[in-house]
Amino acid sequence: MARYTGATCRLCRREGMKLFLKGDRCFTDKCAFVRRSYAPGQHGANKKKVSNYGVQLREKQKARRIYGILEGQFRTYYEKAEHIKGITGENLLKLLEMRLDNIVYRLGYGSSRNEARQLVTHGHFLVNGKKVDICSYHVSVNDVITVCEKSRSSEKFKTFVENPKTLPKWLEANVDNYEGKVVAEPSREDIDVPVNETLIVELYSK
């Protein structure tokens, strides 16, 4: 599957805020955004007037970059969200939250979504007892995500278990069993991403 291979820190600078794409590094002074919080490029430090379209586009780009999704796949998620009963923007975020790589990140098995994505593609997880290595796999309510038996001896997973993450209320975990479960769909209030999904809907509605 195609993916972004450029400098990750440039994405945060482009959006004008930390997107926490590098996990723990983003909380240190080594974070590039701390040193240069303006947009990348020769004229990045110069403030420009942004049109309504530009604001909407930036919001969509921000959401894509937070979840690590390319344009075509993001549009597919939007089209699915349109056909689900409810508010399209909220439906979009819920679909993104229910991706396997995001669930793994939310459970604490990865300091960033990018790291969680790598762990999934390397085959470290089971969903309902079956190995799944597809990051975009849609996890459903009552699905159980488990770390593979052979992966549990890894220092990386031991560290995650020794330092459990605070979970959103729609997830629960059995740390000793290296297991997590989706107990409900996330509500909009549960999704702590700095995105105004209404602007994304306005962009795609044109």
UniProtKB/Swiss-Prot annotation:
Gene Ontology annotations of biological process type: ribosomal small subunit biogenesis; translation
Pfam families, per database record: Ribosomal_S4 (PF00163), S4 (PF01479)
UniProt GO cellular component terms: small ribosomal subunit
Domain S4 RNA-binding: 98-163
Annotated InterPro entries: Ribosomal_uS4, Ribosomal_uS4_bac-type, Ribosomal_uS4_CS, Ribosomal_uS4_N, S4_RNA-bd, S4_RNA-bd_sf
A single MF term (Gene Ontology): structural constituent of ribosome
Keywords tagged on the record: Ribonucleoprotein, Ribosomal protein, RNA-binding, rRNA-binding
Protein family per UniProt: Belongs to the universal ribosomal protein uS4 family.
Subunit structure of this chain's protein: Part of the 30S ribosomal subunit. Contacts protein S5. The interaction surface between S4 and S5 is involved in control of translational fidelity.
Function in brief: One of the primary rRNA binding proteins, it binds directly to 16S rRNA where it nucleates assembly of the body of the 30S subunit. With S5 and S12 plays an important role in translational accuracy.
Protein name: Small ribosomal subunit protein uS4
